[in-house]
A protein has these predicted regions:
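A structural signal for short, well-ordered beta-strand segments
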Residues: 10, 63, 82-84
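Unchanged
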Residues: 36-59, 70-119
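Short, solvent-exposed loop/turn elements at beta->coil junctions and helix N-caps
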Residues: 64-70
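Short, hydrophobic secondary-structure boundary micro-motifs
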Residues: 21, 92-94, 136-137
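Short, well-ordered turn and helix-capping elements at secondary-structure junctions
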Residues: 25, 33-35, 67
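N-terminal strand-loop-strand
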Residues: 1-31, 58, 86
Length: 144
């Protein structure tokens, strides 16, 4: 039986910049987040993931994107992207205790001009570069 993987990601912005993470053993940058645990709802998932990876309790805002894709192994994934409303709280994340810090190689604040970096998923890159990652009133459904 085929399973669908479910992940949640947080879009954290402050002062025109967006927070991205580079996981260990990866050569690209992604929005923080991870897989949903059994019994969790998507909001609980992103709250837990932000605490684990960055040591900050995120103020989860509205759902911005739903992204579906199949990876090279044919596994299907659905990702939920939420606005995180307390971006300033993440500015000093280095000093905070993280339970899963070993999973993160680097945390960076990027501007839309940082086009030389490999940002994923590619389907959000256009919105990021235009500065419209958290704009709009409706949920955007993306497929890649």
């Amino acid at each position: 039986m085929q399973e669908i993987k479910i992940r949640c990601r947080g879009i954290i912005t402050h002062g025109g910049k967006t927070l991205f993470v580079q996981h260990t053993e990866r050569d690209f940058y992604n929005l923080p987040g991870g897989h949903i645990d059994y019994g969790e709802d998507p909001q609980e998932c992103i709250e837990r993931e932000l605490l684990e990876e960055l040591g900050v309790r995120g103020d989860v805002g509205r759902l911005l994107y739903v992204h579906t894709f199949k990876n090279s192994a044919g596994e299907q994934t659905v990702e939920f992207f939420f606005a995180i409303e307390n971006g300033a709280d993440f500015l000093s994340h280095e000093a905070l205790e993280k339970t899963h810090a070993h999973e993160i190689a680097e945390v960076v604040w990027l501007t839309p001009e940082d086009t030389h970096l490999d940002i994923r998923p590619k389907c959000i890159e256009e919105f990021f570069q235009k500065g419209t990652l958290v704009h709009g009133e409706t949920v955007r459904f993306l497929k890649s």
